[in-house]
Structures are given as structure tokens and as C-alpha cells.
Amino acid sequence: MSGRGKGGKGLGKGGAKRHRKVLRDNIQGITKPAIRRLARRGGVKRISGLIYEETRGVLKIFLENVIRDAVTYTEHARRKTVTAMDVVYALKRQGRTLYGFGG
């Protein structure tokens, strides 16, 4: 392995880091019909127009919390890939146990 440690580049010098596209306003990708379908699944018949932005805000906060915890588990295990189990443990930590994804 030539002393590069776990996951080191094999040949060459490794190359420059590629710039990632800055992600913003992706919450608008949760479309009005998608929110409507979730509400229908929950048994809602009629939806106020103000609900959509509010739902996006609540969903964003919820996902930020879950992802933060999942990434913490990943970093503690010294991995770079977030696994399904990291997400399951993150949800369990917040009192929302999820079944069906191992563990």
C-alpha cells in the first residue's frame, strides 16, 4: 500500500480537489404536489396555501438534525460514507425508531 494509509490514491500525486457546486434553495425541490401527497397519506382532505412553505421549513430543520447526528456517527467510526445504520441510530437517538433497515 506504499504507506498512504487507508483509502489513499494508488497512482500519481492525487490531483487537485474538485470544487463542489454550492447547493442552495434545494428545499424548493420538495414540490407542492409532493407535500400534498404526504398530507393525503396522513389523511388530510383540504390544505391551506400557507402550509407548503411551513412544511418545507419544518422538514429542513428535521433533516438537518438527523443528518448532523448521522454524520457524527460516521465521523466517530472514521468513515467517509454515511450508512443506513448511521441514519437509523440518529433517528433512534431522537426518539424516532425506524425498523426495516438492519440493526
Curated annotation (Swiss-Prot):
List GO terms (cellular component aspect).
chloroplast; cytosol; extracellular region; nucleolus; nucleosome; peroxisome; plant-type vacuole; plasma membrane
Give the principal location in a single coarse category: nucleus
Per UniProt, subcellular location reads as:
Nucleus; Chromosome
Name the Gene3D superfamilies for this protein: Histone, subunit A (1.10.20.10)
Task: Give the span(s) annotated as Disordered.
Answer: 1-20
In the record, what terms sit under GO molecular function? DNA binding; protein heterodimerization activity; structural constituent of chromatin
Q: Which SMART domains match?
A: H4 (SM00417)
User: What InterPro entries does this protein's entry cite?
Assistant: CENP-T/H4_C, Histone-fold, Histone_H4, Histone_H4_CS
What are the DNA-binding region positions? Answer: 17-21
GO terms in the biological process aspect are:
response to water deprivation
Q: Looking at the keywords, is Acetylation present?
A: yes
Q: Where is the composition biased (Gly residues)?
A: 1-14
Q: Per its database record, what is this protein's job? A: Core component of nucleosome. Nucleosomes wrap and compact DNA into chromatin, limiting DNA accessibility to the cellular machineries which require DNA as a template. Histones thereby play a central role in transcription regulation, DNA repair, DNA replication and chromosomal stability. DNA accessibility is regulated via a complex set of post-translational modifications of histones, also called histone code, and nucleosome remodeling.
Quaternary structure? Answer: The nucleosome is a histone octamer containing two molecules each of H2A, H2B, H3 and H4 assembled in one H3-H4 heterotetramer and two H2A-H2B heterodimers. The octamer wraps approximately 147 bp of DNA. Interacts with ORTH2. Interacts with AHL27.
Indicate the family of this protein: Belongs to the histone H4 family.
**Identification of the protein by name:** Histone H4
